[in-house]
Curated annotation (Swiss-Prot):
Organism: Xylella fastidiosa (strain Temecula1 / ATCC 700964)
Free-text description of this protein's post-translational modifications in UniProt: Is synthesized initially as an inactive proenzyme. Formation of the active enzyme involves a self-maturation process in which the active site pyruvoyl group is generated from an internal serine residue via an autocatalytic post-translational modification. Two non-identical subunits are generated from the proenzyme in this reaction, and the pyruvate is formed at the N-terminus of the alpha chain, which is derived from the carboxyl end of the proenzyme.
NCBIfam families: SAM_DCase_Eco (TIGR03331)
UniProt name for this protein: S-adenosylmethionine decarboxylase proenzyme
Bound cofactor: record note: Binds 1 pyruvoyl group covalently per subunit.
InterPro entries membership: AdoMetDC_fam_prok, S-AdoMet_deCO2ase_bac, S-AdoMet_deCO2ase_core
Documented EC number(s): 4.1.1.50
Gene that produces this protein: speD
C-alpha cells in the first residue's frame, strides 16, 4: 500500500504525474516448428484484446480511476494492444450536465492518465525457444497511484521475468506556494510487492532517488523444467536432452533479465 506523506493543502489540482512501466516475459521451449507455432497461437488466444481489456479494467478499479475511453486491437499474425484513458474525477456526460459542470481536471489531464498494454509473441528460428512479452504502462496524474496495481499485474500474467520502472514528474504546489515533487514515501518498488511475490522472485534494484526514478527487475528463483516445456514433460526426455534444454532456457532467462547477449 502506498504510504502518503502528511496531507497537503494544495493550490489547485495535484499536478504530479506518476508513471509505472512493466516488461513482463514468459519463456517457453517448444521442440518443433509446429509446436512453436501452436505456442504462439495459444498465447495469442490467451492474451487477446478482450482478455487484456479485462485486466486493464481491473487495474483501473484497483487504483481507483474512472474509465473515459477504451481502444483495443488484435493484430495479424499475432499480438494485441489496448489503451484505456482514465481520470481521477467521475465521468460526467456533457449532454446531461452541461459543459460548465465538467471538471477542468478531467479535460486538462485526460492526455496524461492512461493504461496501455502491447503484446509481443516470438520464437527462435532454430533452437526451440519461444517468448511472450507484455509491455504495460500505467500513467496517472493527481493523487491516484499506479503502484496499487503492482501485485495484480504480476499475478495476472505468466511472469517469469519482470522489469519495472517507476518515476514521478512535475510538481504540485501547496497553499503557501511551496512546490512538492513527490507526495508519498518510497525507496524501492519492492516496498509495494506482496510477501508472496517477494518469496518467489530474485530481485535487483537500480534507483536514482534524487530524480525520483526507481527501477526493479526480477526473475523466478526456482527453475522447474516442466513449467517451461510446451506440450511435453521432462520425464519423457533423455538426460542429455533435459540438460541441453535447461541450459538454453537458463541462458535465455539471464539474457532477458540483463538485457544483453551473454553467449557471444
Amino acid at each position: 500500500m502506498v504510504k502518503p506523506l502528511p496531507r497537503l493543502r494544495l493550490q489547485g489540482f495535484n499536478n504530479l504525474t506518476k508513471a509505472l512501466s512493466f516488461n513482463i516475459y514468459d519463456v517457453c521451449y517448444a521442440r518443433t516448428e509446429e509446436e512453436r507455432q501452436r505456442y504462439i497461437d495459444y498465447i495469442d488466444e490467451r492474451y487477446d484484446a478482450d482478455r487484456l481489456t479485462q485486466i486493464l479494467t481491473d487495474v483501473a478499479e484497483i487504483i481507483g480511476a474512472n474509465i473515459l475511453n477504451i481502444a483495443r486491437q488484435d493484430y495479424d499474425p499475432q499480438g494485441a494492444s489496448v489503451t484505456i484513458l482514465i481520470s481521477e474525477e467521475p465521468v460526467i456526460d456533457k449532454k446531461q450536465a452541461g459543459k460548465e459542470l465538467i471538471s477542468d481536471a478531467v479535460v486538462t489531464h485526460m492526455d496524461k492518465s492512461h493504461i496501455t498494454v502491447h503484446t509481443y509473441p516470438e520464437t527462435h528460428p532454430q533452437e526451440g525457444i519461444a517468448t511472450f512479452r507484455a509491455d504495460i504502462d500505467v500513467a496517472t496524474c493527481g493523487v491516484i497511484s499506479p503502484l496499487k496495481a503492482l501485485n495484480y499485474l504480476i499475478e495476472s500474467l505468466e511472469s517469469d521475468i519482470v522489469i519495472m520502472d517507476y518515476r514521478v514528474r512535475g510538481f504540485t504546489r501547496d497553499v503557501k506556494g511551496k512546490k512538492h515533487f513527490i507526495d508519498h514515501k518510497i525507496n524501492s518498488i519492492q516496498n509495494f510487492l506482496s510477501k508472496s511475490i517477494k518469496s518467489r522472485y530474485e530481485m535487483f534494484d537500480v534507483n536514482v532517488y534524487q530524480e525520483n526514478i526507481f527501477h526493479t527487475k526480477m526473475h523466478l528463483k526456482d527453475f522447474d523444467l516442466d513449467q517451461y516445456l510446451f506440450e511435453e514433460k521432462a520425464r519423457n526426455l533423455s538426460f542429455k536432452e533435459r540438460m541441453k534444454i535447461e541450459a538454453l532456457l537458463k541462458l535465455e532467462i539471464e539474457e532477458l533479465f540483463h538485457g544483453r547477449n551473454l553467449a557471444e
